[in-house]
UniProtKB/Swiss-Prot annotation:
Protein family: Belongs to the bacterial ribosomal protein bL12 family.
Gene3D superfamilies: 3.30.1390.10, Single helix bin (1.20.5.710)
Molecular function in Gene Ontology: mRNA binding; structural constituent of ribosome
Keyword terms, alphabetized: Ribonucleoprotein, Ribosomal protein
Top-level taxon in the UniProt lineage: Bacteria
InterPro entries (alphabetical): Ribosomal_bL12, Ribosomal_bL12_C, Ribosomal_bL12_C/ClpS-like, Ribosomal_bL12_oligo, Ribosomal_bL12_oligo_N_sf
Protein name listed in UniProt: Large ribosomal subunit protein bL12
A Gene Ontology cellular-component term: cytosolic large ribosomal subunit
Family annotation (HAMAP family): Ribosomal_bL12
A Pfam family per the record: Ribosomal_L12_N
Protein's job: Forms part of the ribosomal stalk which helps the ribosome interact with GTP-bound translation factors. Is thus essential for accurate translation.
SUPFAM superfamilies: ClpS-like, Ribosomal protein L7/12, oligomerisation (N-terminal) domain
Name of the gene: rplL
CDD domains per the UniProt record, alphabetical: Ribosomal_L7_L12 (cd00387)
Amino acid sequence: MALDTEKIIADLKEASILELNDLVKAIEEEFGVSAAASVAVAGAAGADGAAEKDSFDVELTDAGSAKVKVIKAVKDITGLGLKDAKGLVDGAPSVIKEGVAKDEAEELKAKLEEVGAKVTLK
């Protein structure tokens, strides 16, 4: 069975939003996957978009006055070498870890703030 990509795309262009929504749900059920990225993008436009978010990026916004401690914490969190960890800290704002669960993101934020860094979760 060969797929005709152009025919599939043409059929998708002609489908209504409701039909496309049903298709996405059927694909999610059939293959056990989630279209969470598209939901997160759509939800971000609404006021409750942050409440539905399930993965976060931990961003170092400022190293503060205890830069050496922050570099060590970044090194421990990321598993990077000392030079690379220093580069992340010196290049703030920089993302320390991407796509982590909310509880892990809050734990990492607490560790970094404990040594004097300023951190945001995105």
